Amino acid sequence: MENLAWSPFKSLTAEQREQIDRFREQLLRFNQRVNLISPETEDTFRTRHLLHCLTLTARDFPAGCTVVDWGTGGGLPAIPLAICHPEATVVGVDSVGKKSRAVRTIARRLGLDNCFTWNGRADEWTGEAHYSVSRATAPLADLWAWHRRVAVSPDDPNGDAWPPGLLALKGGDLSDEVAALHAADPDARVERHSLNDLLGRNGFFGEKEIVAVRS
């Protein structure tokens, strides 16, 4: 991790590092009973899951904002974001009850008062959010439709923050997804940020990117 061009770990406080380590321990413990992540990826959790999610912290989330994580699964990226942004509210939405309950318990054990879960379909959540995030959950057009339904603008986003909207962790050929998104909403603005460029490494992150969508 020390050879990364940019590393989210360097800016973490000692308390946040401890919370990250405890999150890994708790998630792997729950994973023995609930399928939160693939067992084959447990040994590479720090890279394949944690670092992947923390690339979203390359830019800021304003204090007081609400972030909704569609299909949070094992709390990825909801819990890492809640750890790194204690002044933001993070809501993990998942339709699988046992996953939602596991994430709720993990967040409570980590002392994350800013992290919540909601069990149900994404298109039925009735809250409001300034940002939506997602990791391997649904096509961009669906994610954007879910975000637009609940979107509100931050009061005063700072210049270092992500523009309000959708931030999706994606990989592979996205041409069809982007085309479908623009067919559904021709005015949607899409920015694509290569994780390989951000992190300065090949391998797992070679074709992965953050897709930022905003109005």
Swiss-Prot record:
Location relative to the cell: Cytoplasm
Lineage: Bacteria, Pseudomonadati, Rhodothermota, Rhodothermia, Rhodothermales
Residues that, per the record, bind S-adenosyl-L-methionine: G71, L76, R135
Function of the protein: Specifically methylates the N7 position of a guanine in 16S rRNA.
PANTHER family, per the entry: S-ADENOSYL-L-METHIONINE-DEPENDENT METHYLTRANSFERASES SUPERFAMILY PROTEIN
Name recorded for this polypeptide: Ribosomal RNA small subunit methyltransferase G
SUPFAM superfamilies to which the protein is assigned, alphabetical: S-adenosyl-L-methionine-dependent methyltransferases
Annotated Gene Ontology cellular component terms: cytosol
Enzyme Commission (EC) number: 2.1.1.-
Family in the record: Belongs to the methyltransferase superfamily. RNA methyltransferase RsmG family.
Stored HAMAP family: 16SrRNA_methyltr_G (MF_00074)
Primary location class: cytoplasm
Keyword set, alphabetical order: Cytoplasm, Methyltransferase, rRNA processing, S-adenosyl-L-methionine, Transferase
InterPro entries membership: rRNA_ssu_MeTfrase_G (IPR003682), SAM-dependent_MTases_sf (IPR029063)
Gene Ontology terms for molecular function: rRNA (guanine-N7-)-methyltransferase activity
Protein's gene: rsmG
Top-level EC class as recorded in UniProt: transferase
